Amino acid sequence: FNKPLIAKIMYFLRILPMVRQRDGLRNVLKNHDTQEIIIETIENDVRFCMYPEGRHRPAHSLLPLGKGIFRAALAANAKFGESKPVYIVPTGIEYGDYFRYRSTSLVTFGKPLNVTEFIKGLDVENEAQMMEPLRKELSARMSELFSYLPDGEDLQDRWTLVKMMSV
């Protein structure tokens, strides 16, 4: 997104940047513009994809979910949640072989999480307090959608066992 031509193409395709604090505080302020585009997209009933982990690794586990997806959902809910509910659809992506080119993959969609209803049931007052229960719920739902193996020293051994048992 630092190259103007590439940035224009990415924005046209609705591939939007979410900047982290490690990229500099000045750059983090650009997330406000991205969030406005996301809210407008949701309000117009256009579906889009957001990767809440923000990165990947070749393991069948779930990385910590970033705040971006929750900030966007809560901002959209604050803007129009009374008239139209806001949903997050948990998705699991399972790779047949992470390192092999043209390997298989399986995309599984879970039951949509109605953010509007979920936060109504919370006894909290501010956005920061809403994020943690949302994060836990989405993490739990995503973990059910792929061969989830919790982090640990024997992660590779457990994955080998899962592959052997699936044959």
Go through each PLM region and give its residues:
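Long, charge-rich alpha-helical interaction segments
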Residues: 125-167
